[in-house]
């Protein structure tokens, strides 16, 4: 335990740096003085905050819960992606690391699913798959504004899955869980629909949020 704790704290450092970089890029977007200025920092504000900061924290929490050594590669890859994004290295390298990190996060959920086939895990897996889809689109040079529905679905479904997990203690029926799963599928489909029609994607995402 004494050995594991410093290791986990080390993995938190890139996430904390991603938060600071995200706040720095927010100042740049507002046209205010910022401690750090680079050519691409303001352009990657969204991915820094969602993929690098929140993604690292969520992946680390999942890795700790899973317990396997390879699960820690997910937060490590996401944190490394953040460090590379702020370095002179090509952004493509950072994007590749983030894609790998979310691919591993999906693998973590799949591994847990084999042992515990629960609806809340399915919802969280949909969230991780949304992040992976968004990261792949970012790697394919899709503009960041078009990634917003994917990043939103990642956070919404992750939080929804955790809420379903916590509420299981007070429920005697599975119907609310099943309802949450079908709503999660709607939210999961919305970003893909937004690639075809931004308006309809927003409408479907809004309906999904109302359903929650």
Language-model regions, residue ranges each:
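Hydrophobic alpha-helical transmembrane segments of multi-pass integral membrane proteins
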Residues: 1-212
């Amino acid at each position: 335990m004494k050995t594991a704790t410093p290791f986990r704290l080390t993995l938190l450092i890139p996430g904390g740096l991603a938060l600071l970089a995200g706040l720095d890029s927010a100042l740049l977007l507002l046209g205010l003085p910022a401690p750090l200025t680079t050519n691409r920092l303001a352009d990657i504000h969204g991915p820094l905050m969602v993929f690098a900061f929140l993604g690292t924290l969520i992946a680390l929490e999942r890795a700790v819960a899973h317990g396997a050594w390879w699960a820690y590669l997910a937060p490590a890859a996401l944190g490394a992606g953040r460090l590379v994004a702020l370095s002179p290295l090509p952004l493509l390298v950072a994007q590749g690391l983030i894609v790998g990190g979310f691919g591993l996060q999906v693998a973590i959920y799949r591994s847990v699913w084999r042992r515990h086939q629960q609806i809340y895990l399915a919802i969280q897996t949909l969230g991780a798959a949304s992040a992976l889809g968004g990261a792949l689109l970012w790697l394919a040079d899709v503009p960041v504004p078009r990634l917003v529905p994917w990043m939103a679905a990642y956070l919404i479904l992750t939080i929804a899955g955790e809420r379903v997990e916590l509420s299981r203690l007070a429920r005697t029926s599975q119907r609310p869980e099943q309802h949450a799963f079908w709503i999660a599928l709607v939210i999961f489909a919305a970003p893909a629909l937004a690639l075809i029609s931004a308006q309809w994607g927003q409408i479907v995402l809004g309906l999904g949020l109302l359903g929650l």
